[in-house]
Amino acid sequence: ERDYIVPEKFEDFVYVGLVLQGQGIRHGLEAHRRNRPYCMGTLYWQLNDSWPVVSWSGIDYYGNWKALHYQAKRAFAPVHINPVRQNDSLCVYLLSDRLESMENLALEMKVTDFNGRKVGKTIQLKSVSVPANTSRCVYRAKREELLPEGADTSRHCFMQLTLKDKSGHTVAETVCFFDKTK
């Protein structure tokens, strides 16, 4: 009820439950990675099923990935962008499990509506560095600074975040919704 409209059909209930589980696991993994050095690793239970069933595993009996496993893969990427909504602000963390620092990266953040149109300002941070084995906030802004003026657009748009190396190759990317899913 808090994050999604409660489905009426069983099949929809299973689907929404698996999507919500994936989001919850990703949220937890990102929080653990963000809180380094106090948390230096995370395992989740359980990887796979030993018979066909709807369960909390990340991989089903037939070897198919569930939403949880896709979200865990994203959250465990060696370099990960983690935007965090904190009250009326957004803080963008860069998380790195690499053993080498990364220099001269560019972080682009643009607000887009659900039709693909740019609706807010595009923010570009150049010469971003990500030290080895770190978690750090590289950008912080008030929500109203990111969204266009006028009507309540937080429900009608999202932010795309892309981290690129000096050759223009994408190192990491993610999206941030300004409002709850439902």
Can you describe what each PLM-predicted range is?
Residues 90-96, 138-140, 159-163:
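Buried hydrophobic-core signal for structured, non-transmembrane domains
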Residues 99, 116-117, 168:
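Residue-level signal for glycine
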Residues 103-107, 157:
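Short beta-strand/loop motifs in extracellular/secreted proteins, especially
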Residues 105, 121-122, 170-174:
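Extracellular and select intracellular beta-sandwich modules with Ser/Thr-enriched
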